[in-house]
Amino acid sequence: MSITKDQIIEAVAAMSVMDVVELISAMEEKFGVSAAAAVAVAAGPVETAEEKTEFDVILKAAGANKVAVIKAVRGATGLGLKEAKDLVESAPAALKEGVSKDDAEALKKALEEAGAEVEVK
């Protein structure tokens, strides 16, 4: 008569904790395995990707309507006319750094409507 899996499970369930520890040790020696190694691998840390919270808005090119882009840059950055013109003409250039996603997307939209080519990083 062979022992079934259910009978083995019932026998282990009836054992004390110390008896189960001794059984595990005996099985590790008999079969040359380690229960701790399998547990350590299964319980490894799970890495989570952090969501980026700060973005940089880069003016890649002014486009055909440079005057409208300069006005949009002045409105977004608070720069004077000459500074905004120099910034637009020196494209690619960083307009704003470390802004929120919503602010970066709003600035990108405004500049693209003026005819600029913009990138958010």
Curated annotation (Swiss-Prot):
Key word Ribosomal protein present: yes
Keywords of this entry: Ribonucleoprotein, Ribosomal protein
InterPro entries: Ribosomal_bL12, Ribosomal_bL12_C, Ribosomal_bL12_C/ClpS-like, Ribosomal_bL12_oligo, Ribosomal_bL12_oligo_N_sf
Matches recorded under CDD domains: Ribosomal_L7_L12
Domain of life: Bacteria
BP term (GO), one: translation
GO cellular component: cytosolic large ribosomal subunit
The keyword Repeat is assigned to this record: no
Function, as annotated: Forms part of the ribosomal stalk which helps the ribosome interact with GTP-bound translation factors. Is thus essential for accurate translation.
Quaternary structure, from the entry: Homodimer. Part of the ribosomal stalk of the 50S ribosomal subunit. Forms a multimeric L10(L12)X complex, where L10 forms an elongated spine to which 2 to 4 L12 dimers bind in a sequential fashion. Binds GTP-bound translation factors.
UniProt-listed PANTHER family: 39S RIBOSOMAL PROTEIN L12 (PTHR45987), LARGE RIBOSOMAL SUBUNIT PROTEIN BL12M (PTHR45987:SF4)
Protein name (database record): Large ribosomal subunit protein bL12
Organism of this sequence: Escherichia coli O81 (strain ED1a)
Name of the gene encoding the protein in the UniProt record: rplL
